[in-house]
Swiss-Prot record:
<keyword id="KW-0819">tRNA processing</keyword>
<dbReference type="Pfam" id="PF01171">
    <property type="entry name" value="ATP_bind_3"/>
</dbReference>
<feature type="binding site">
    <location>
        <begin position="58"/>
        <end position="63"/>
    </location>
    <ligand>
        <name>ATP</name>
    </ligand>
</feature>
<dbReference type="GO" id="GO:0005737">
    <property type="term" value="C:cytoplasm"/>
</dbReference>
<keyword id="KW-0963">Cytoplasm</keyword>
<keyword id="KW-0067">ATP-binding</keyword>
<dbReference type="GO" id="GO:0006400">
    <property type="term" value="P:tRNA modification"/>
</dbReference>
<keyword id="KW-0547">Nucleotide-binding</keyword>
<dbReference type="InterPro" id="IPR012795">
    <property type="entry name" value="tRNA_Ile_lys_synt_N"/>
</dbReference>
<comment type="similarity">
    <text>Belongs to the tRNA(Ile)-lysidine synthase family.</text>
</comment>
<dbReference type="GO" id="GO:0005524">
    <property type="term" value="F:ATP binding"/>
</dbReference>
<comment type="function">
    <text>Ligates lysine onto the cytidine present at position 34 of the AUA codon-specific tRNA(Ile) that contains the anticodon CAU, in an ATP-dependent manner. Cytidine is converted to lysidine, thus changing the amino acid specificity of the tRNA from methionine to isoleucine.</text>
</comment>
<dbReference type="InterPro" id="IPR014729">
    <property type="entry name" value="Rossmann-like_a/b/a_fold"/>
</dbReference>
<protein>
    <recommendedName>
        <fullName>tRNA(Ile)-lysidine synthase</fullName>
        <ecNumber>6.3.4.19</ecNumber>
    </recommendedName>
</protein>
<dbReference type="Pfam" id="PF09179">
    <property type="entry name" value="TilS"/>
</dbReference>
<dbReference type="GO" id="GO:0032267">
    <property type="term" value="F:tRNA(Ile)-lysidine synthase activity"/>
</dbReference>
<dbReference type="InterPro" id="IPR012094">
    <property type="entry name" value="tRNA_Ile_lys_synt"/>
</dbReference>
Length: 352
């Protein structure tokens, strides 16, 4: 008799991601994966030959299910499995809970396992600040242990929430594409559960008798995502019927495909709108489709030093009006002390 369907689903999702990681490790640079010859990745003397994959685990149902699936699948594929839990220090006793998570991960057979404490700032609000601190800690842990990848437990439900949050902000198609299955420097972060619903992950924990911790912040109406999860999505499903989460997740993937195509188009078009000095020619920018032109403008602002997290669509729209609605207006101030101005038919974006 095979495993429970929920357990089978989470294991299959992790197995596929581990196969992807191994394929990439065994593929020489510049050689298509389909034609690569199996080989052992070159590693520094003294390091274990088996690649290490870490799981980021809060102790909640999603990440505990992910940890259990990694613990099961990794040794079958010759992969070492480890875990990291991040103590944000935002709740009383969070250090003790982090220690409990470490014990649970070790009981699953993961090694190495560690808890790392972070200080959460205030930039961008509590949710964004906690996320930034968490990823910084995970980056450091991955570098410290030489991990090939870090698995994150985001589910299809999380993806649906992310799409709705982007929609509410009036964001572009990139925000509507939600979370990528592969992200971070060198594809460090992997999200195996983006096609797995939250209920399946919780069921997998239950049938495996895995203890889980329900973060009270996830039910706190002070947090936007919590309100969306407990009020917004249920209201949508009541009004529109079941299948809203699946539809939003599908929208994310379709949007990502479109956004990737537009990004590629913009990169290819950028060379054609720059003059001999590297400046942007307004007439050539004007001739491009708006979606392509604005991507070029955003890239130019980022290259000039504007922080991506503070550079919003309204900023790019203001810069775009220097091209499409030119009336002799003055310079546009962007985040990061970056200034955009039109000079003699050229658009100049640089530090003020």
């Amino acid at each position: 008799m095979g495993p429970h369907p929920a357990v089978a689903a989470i294991r299959l999702a992790v197995r596929r991601v581990l196969h992807d990681i191994l394929t990439e490790l065994n593929t020489p640079a510049g050689v298509p994966a389909a034609t690569a010859v199996e080989r052992t990745p070159e590693r520094a003397p003294g390091l274990p030959t088996a690649p290490l994959v870490l799981v980021a685990c809060s102790g909640g149902a999603d990440s505990m299910a992910l940890a259990s699936a990694l613990a099961f699948e990794a040794p079958r594929l010759g992969v070492r499995a480890g875990g990291v839990t991040v103590d944000h220090g935002l709740q009383s006793g969070s250090d003790l809970r982090a220690e409990e998570v470490v014990l649970r991960l070790r009981e699953l057979g993961l090694d190495p396992v560690e808890a790392t404490a972070v200080t959460v700032g205030r930039a961008g609000g509590p949710e964004a600040a906690a996320r930034d601190a968490r990823y910084a800690a995970l980056d450091a842990a991955a570098a410290r242990h030489g991990a090939a990848a870090v698995l994150l437990g985001h589910t299809r439900d999380d993806q649906a929430e992310t799409v709705l949050l982007g929609l509410a902000r009036g964001s572009g198609i990139r925000s509507l594409s939600g979370m990528a299955a592969v992200s971070g420097a060198g594809g460090r972060y992997r999200r195996p559960f983006l096609q797995v619903d939250r209920q399946t992950a919780r069921k997998a924990c239950m049938v495996q008798s895995l203890p889980v911790w329900d973060d009270p912040h996830n039910a706190d109406p002070a947090y936007t995502r919590s309100r969306l999860r407990h009020e917004g999505l249920p209201a949508l499903e009541k009004a529109l019927g079941k299948g809203v989460v699946e539809a939003l997740a599908r929208t994310a993937q379709l949007s990502r495909d479109d956004a990737d195509a537009l990004d590629t188009w913009a990169r290819q078009a950028e060379a054609g709108v720059r003059d001999a000095t590297g400046g942007l020619e307004c007439a050539k920018l004007y001739a491009l489709p708006p979606a392509v032109r604005r991507r070029i403008l955003r890239r130019a602002a980022l290259e000039a030093g504007a922080p991506g997290g503070a550079l919003f669509a309204r900023h790019i729209e203001e810069v775009d009006r220097l091209i499409t609605g030119w009336r002799g207006q003055g310079a546009i101030n962007l985040p990061g002390k970056v200034v955009a101005r039109r000079q003699g038919g050229r658009l100049v974006i640089r530090q003020g």
